[in-house]
Regions:
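A short acidic, helix-capping loop that chelates divalent metal ions and anchors anionic groups
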Residues: 33-38, 103, 125-132, 194-198, ...
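Radical SAM/AdoMet-radical enzyme domain recognition
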Residues: 42, 48-65, 70, 74-188
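A short, compositionally biased micro-patch
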Residues: 18-20, 112, 265
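Short, small-residue-rich loop/turn micro-motifs
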Residues: 19-21, 29-32, 121-123, 189, ...
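Residues that scaffold the ATP/ADP-binding catalytic core of kinase and kinase-like folds
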Residues: 24, 28, 74, 127, ...
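Canonical Radical SAM [4Fe-4S] cluster-binding loop centered on the CxxxCxxC motif
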Residues: 5-46
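Glycine-centered loop/turn positions within well-structured domains
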Residues: 23, 126-127, 254, 280
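Auxiliary Fe-S-binding modules of radical SAM enzymes
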Residues: 1-13, 176-180, 187-329
Length: 329
């Protein structure tokens, strides 16, 4: 079991498979110049599967989410999914992706054992997409969403970040589109994890702003909430249901007290929180020949020291050096 001093138990593992991405979203990465992790520093496929095996069989992990960077850029992804699906007990498996590669991989991922996907899409307007991502790939994302739905990677969830002056007027339009295509839309407040360290709280679109915008077109009814942890979105029935929309207020209404996550970076570091300054090296233990029991002990010790909260409201808060692309969302 991965328990911390506040009694929280981690059952949800986020595994970053790469820090590389084929988009350059303005709230995540610079257009040029980001230093990639060196290939020898990255965990290989066997190391990733071994760590997931330890997490599932010895530490109580029930769900594994593959992230990046962009996880579809990982050459061995389908094989990793297939091997994790063969574990006993078998964890639930999901993937967070920009969707560009889903058209060619969705069916194979489903056959390998992937359960569902979350796809990032911030706008329905190709010109705004190009401005936000610095790439002209909007059509590829839309086609990837269709492929995921057709392959049965459902429910397909769409994650959207609204940025002032770019797409902050699109919330109702995005929700109408998601309802039409039977996707579950979730709006996420922009977090201080950009590589440029340019985030400012007073410049972000808040959960309150998003809900106000949505209510100009839809009737929203709060859905009965269970604990916010691996499912942190506050969910709202749209026009009485059955469709729902989620809002993840990581900044203005954080859910740290119910957090059930542990994170593994592409270079084998355990992180207790997206915003943590500290990391614990599992790669060194792996490569020095440590047995599974020792790796599990190191992991437990790392999670035991997890802080009470992210500290975004603390005047002394310092953004972590790693950007989101190198942590894994």
């Amino acid at each position: 079991m991965l328990i911390d001093t506040y009694g929280r138990v981690a059952t949800d593992l986020r595994v970053s498979l790469t820090d590389r991405c084929n988009l350059r979203c303005t709230y995540c990465m610079p257009e040029e110049g980001l230093q990639w992790l060196a290939k020898p520093d990255l965990l290989n496929d066997d190391e990733i599967v071994r760590l997931i095996d330890i997490a599932v069989t010895s530490l109580g992990i029930e769900e594994v989410r593959f992230t990046g960077g962009e996880p579809l850029l990982r050459p061995g992804l389908v094989g990793i999914v297939e091997r994790v699906a063969a574990l006993d007990p078998r964890p639930q498996m999901s993937l967070t992706t920009n969707g560009i590669g889903l058209k060619r991989t969705a069916a194979a991922l489903k056959a390998a054992g992937l359960d569902r996907v979350n796809v990032s899409l911030d706008t329905l307007r190709p010109d705004v997409f190009k401005t936000l991502t610095r790439r002209d790939r909007h059509k590829d994302v839309i086609e990837g969403l269709y492929a995921a739905r057709d392959a049965g990677l459902t429910p397909v969830k769409v994650n959207s970040v609204l940025m002032p002056g770019l797409n902050d007027d699109e919330a109702p339009e995005l929700l109408a589109w998601a309802v039409e295509h039977d996707y579950e839309l979730r709006f996420i407040e922009q977090m201080p994890l950009d590589a440029q360290h340019g985030w400012k709280r007073d410049g972000m679109i808040t959960a309150g702003d998003i809900l106000t915008s949505l209510r100009t077109r839809f009737e929203l009814t709060a859905e009965g909430q269970e604990k916010r942890g691996s499912a942190p979105a506050e969910r709202w029935l749209v026009d009485g249901g059955p469709h729902v929309v989620g809002v993840i207020a990581s900044v203005t209404r954080p859910f740290c007290s119910a957090c059930d996550r542990t994170r593994l970076t592409a270079d084998g570091q355990v992180r207790t929180c997206l915003f943590a300054q500290e990391e614990t090296d599992l790669r060194a233990a792996l490569r020095s020949g440590a047995p599974d029991e020792e790796i599990a002990r190191i992991w437990r010790l790392a999670m035991w020291g997890k802080k009470a909260g992210a500290g975004l409201d603390d005047p002394t808060f310092v953004q972590p050096d790693r950007p989101m692309s190198a942590i894994g969302g």
